A protein has these predicted regions:
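Conserved SAM-binding loop
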Residues: 2-87, 163-168
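S-adenosyl-L-methionine-dependent methyltransferase catalytic module, highlighting the catalytic core
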Residues: 59-62, 66-68, 72, 76-168
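N-terminal start-of-chain detector that recognizes signal peptides
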Residues: 1, 50, 134-138
């Protein structure tokens, strides 16, 4: 089984959608990311695209422990999220791109999209590749690497990061 946790309305072929909001059309499992009703070591891959930044730092330990519980040994965890360092560099350099919303590469990466009006869509913690790799290592993940981003066209390459790790 492969999970797309925090799927929203995005269906990904080969992945089972998980979201805490029942109205999300792609969610086949309605559950919080820190309490998914599946057996231990029953998942071969977890993908969480633009989800991990929505947790407070103190929640991240519980969330990652749940995902580790679900993954088989050697199972893959893929996280894609804003890179706080790139967001800050974009602010300091004055890099403003994104069409109608020129602050997508900077402030949106830090705070989230201000148009939602939904407190759960706010970003609650920022990560850099270094801090996220250290966090995952601390939680027993191995073979941690940074890969080119694949989602969020506005942020690809200039704002976001993609980290892939394996459960140790």
């Amino acid at each position: 089984m492969k999970l797309n946790i925090g799927c929203g309305s995005r269906k990904v072929p080969g992945f089972t959608g998980v979201d805490a909001v029942a109205e999300r059309t792609a969610a086949e499992i309605v559950a919080r990311a820190d309490n998914i009703p599946l057996p231990d070591q029953s998942v071969e891959e977890i993908m969480a695209i633009h989800l991990f930044e929505h947790f407070y730092r103190w929640e991240c330990d519980t969330v990652i422990a749940e995902w580790k519980r679900l993954l088989i040994p050697g199972g893959v965890l893929t996280l894609e999220l804003p890179n706080l360092k790139k967001c800050c560099e974009n602010i300091l350099s004055g890099r403003m791109e994104g069409g109608k919303h020129p602050d997508q590469l900077s402030y949106w990466g830090i705070y989230g999209d201000p148009r939602h009006g939904d407190q759960f869509m706010a970003h609650r913690w920022g990560w850099t590749p270094e801090t996220l790799k250290a966090f995952l290592t601390e939680h027993g993940f191995v073979k941690i690497k940074e890969e080119p981003t694949q989602c969020h066209p506005a942020g690809r390459n200039h704002r976001d990061m993609r980290i892939v790790a394996r459960r140790g």
